[in-house]
Each structure stands twice: as structure tokens, then as C-alpha cells.
Amino acid sequence: CPEMMEMFRLMEQKGVFLSITLEDGAVQVPEMEEVIQECPDLKIAVGHFGMVTVPGWMEQIRLARHKNVMIESGGITWLFNDEFYPFKGAVKAILQAADEVGIDKLMWGSDYPRTITAITYRMSYDFILKTPDFTEESKELFLGLNAARFYGINTEIDLPYIKNMSE
């Protein structure tokens, strides 16, 4: 729709990020490709890891082949909640996506507070920290450095750990 494209152009001009969850599977991928072509400098974060448990999810992941698109994994533990911690299916999916677009295009997300009904906040990232399937560098990139680069966050600041109420 022209009004939405106008809004996306304005977001691009103003440096506003677009954080978006698409319809399950590949349904909205062609429309998102149009937005990416029209607004090549609009920073886009595709949410919920492309709805990884639904057929066609990899089409959403492939959007990250564009320089301005990242994939965030908020909700991935919810999507793999049936298998529960340590979410081996989620780890496998992240590795598949990394093979497709590179680990530098993927960002961790908690989907907090929704996930507090099923897991602790620590569990939402601990399954990555404790898996032997990622290198230490991949863990650092996925758990924070990629997001810091994408959103322009200064990682030089040393913040103290604050215990979360759900731990």
C-alpha cells in the first residue's frame, strides 16, 4: 500500500528501525523484498526467527542476505517449548540459519516477559551459552555483539549484572 511505503521511506530518512514480525512462512516475503528494494538503508529486524517451526521459515531468514536486514530470535524458546530446555531444535535452527546467511546476521532475543510463563530469563540465553555447538565467537556475536552493531550500541560500557526477578 502506498501509505505504508511512504512511512517506510520516512523511517529510512529519519534513521528509525523497523522491527517486524511477518506472517508465518513465506507469505509476506515478496512484499518485504519490495520494501527492502525501495528502502535499501532502512534497518529492518525480522522477528521471531522467521517463525522457525512453520514451513517456509527459511525464506524469511534469507531476507538477511540484504545488508540492512537482521533476524532476531525473540520467541524461539517459545516456539520450541514442546521440547523444552536446552532447546536442541532451536540450536539446530540457529545453526541452519547461520549456514544460510552468516552468524553475523542473527541476533538473540528473549521475547520477555511473555516467556516468563514457561522459562526463566536466564534459560532464554543459557541454552546458547551452554551448547557445545557454537564457538565462543559465535556466542558473543549472537548474544550481543551483532545487536550492538546493528542498533549502534556502545559495548565499551561495563554494566553490573542485575539479578532478574524470575531467576
Annotated model-derived regions:
Residues 95-96, 100-107, 116-167:
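Mid-to-C-terminal alpha-helical segments outside catalytic/metal-binding sites
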Residues 1-107, 159-167:
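Catalytic pocket-lining loop regions of alpha/beta-barrel enzymes
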Residues 111:
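Catalytic cores of Mg2+-dependent Asp-rich isoprenoid enzymes
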